[in-house]
Amino acid sequence: MSALLGLPPEVQDTCISLGLMLLVVLFMGLARVIARQQLHRPMVHAFVLEFLATFQLCYCTHELQLLSEQDSGHPTWTLTLIYFFSLVHGLTLVGTASNPCGVMMQMILGGMSPEMGAVRLMAQLVSALCSRYCISALWSLSLTKYHFDERILACRNPINTDISKAIIIEAICSFIFHSALLHFQEVRTKLRIHVLAALITFLAYAGGSLTGALFNPALALSLHFPCFDESFYKFFVVYWVAPSLGVLLMILMFSFFLPWLHNNQLSNKKE
């Protein structure tokens, strides 16, 4: 800690935020190891792992959002952090979705039972809400000048465009991300994680200034819960319905339209 005292205040705050994120990642990793060793019932095991994964994602995103506002004049630094922590999440959160849309996709494609899907969805929503209270308690300690609990209790509207465009942006981001998630399953793990991290960074760059480009209902609930309370319909449609529609359109496209097109091309070649 003494090594930070000689640094400018802004750099100190950034280092503290990064340190807190890494501590949360390490703590959640330790908790996952203990859970895998001690929990043997599939439902309980899945609930705890999904809870821990969603908590890690939500906390790190809260801090990243804080850092992006702190250094808004240098978006390259923020995008670098998004890419780095996307890699961290990809490496540490294997086997979990941390996203209701991902669970929905697996359920529709038959990769997960409805019961297991319901358990994972419940874990994600509970974790998203719990993360807010934990972050509020931590930020109330004022470890940096940007950490104060009133910040997380206020609605900071992230939608900087009209609602129709916001819906389209979130739906397209969800469509693209889950398409990649589905079709890169056969790619080597090390390469797949980098590709998905780069894609997340690109989507954050393309749509972040308009809606935040979250394409994750649980994460949106954690980040913008006061806004859901003030304008439920608007935020529910943009951050819950739109990403879900993106996943449904992706599944319909690749399960029905593209196979039909492929078969039609084969029949034309035979003729």
Swiss-Prot record:
Instruction: Name the residues that span the membrane.
Output: 15-35, 42-62, 77-97, 167-187, 195-215, 235-255
A Pfam cross-reference name: MIP
Output this protein's name.
Aquaporin-11
From the UniProt record, report the name of the gene that encodes this protein.
Answer: Aqp11
Q: Which UniProt keywords apply?
A: Cell membrane, Cytoplasmic vesicle, Disulfide bond, Endoplasmic reticulum, Membrane, Repeat, Transmembrane, Transmembrane helix, Transport
- GO terms for biological process? endosomal lumen acidification; glycerol transmembrane transport; hydrogen peroxide transmembrane transport; intracellular oxygen homeostasis; intracellular water homeostasis; kidney development; negative regulation of epithelial cell proliferation; negative regulation of ERAD pathway
Question: What function does the entry list?
Answer: Channel protein that facilitates the transport of water, glycerol and hydrogen peroxide across membrane of cell or organelles guaranteeing intracellular homeostasis in several organes like liver, kidney and brain. In situation of stress, participates in endoplasmic reticulum (ER) homeostasis by regulating redox homeostasis through the transport of hydrogen peroxide across the endoplasmic reticulum membrane thereby regulating the oxidative stress through the NADPH oxidase 2 pathway.
Q: How is it modified after translation?
A: Not glycosylated.
Q: How does it assemble?
A: Homodimer; disulfide-linked. Homotetramer. Can also form homomultimer.
Origin superkingdom = Eukaryota
Q: What is its main location?
A: endoplasmic reticulum
Among Gene3D superfamilies, the record links this protein to:
Glycerol uptake facilitator protein
Q: Where in the cell is it found?
A: Endoplasmic reticulum membrane; Cytoplasmic vesicle membrane; Cell membrane
Is the ATP-binding keyword given for this protein? no
> In this UniProt entry, which residues form the Lumenal topological domain(s)?
36-41, 98-166, 216-234
Q: Give the reactions, separated by semicolons, that this protein catalyses.
A: H2O(in) = H2O(out); glycerol(in) = glycerol(out); H2O2(out) = H2O2(in)
As for family, the record states:
Belongs to the MIP/aquaporin (TC 1.A.8) family. AQP11/AQP12 subfamily.
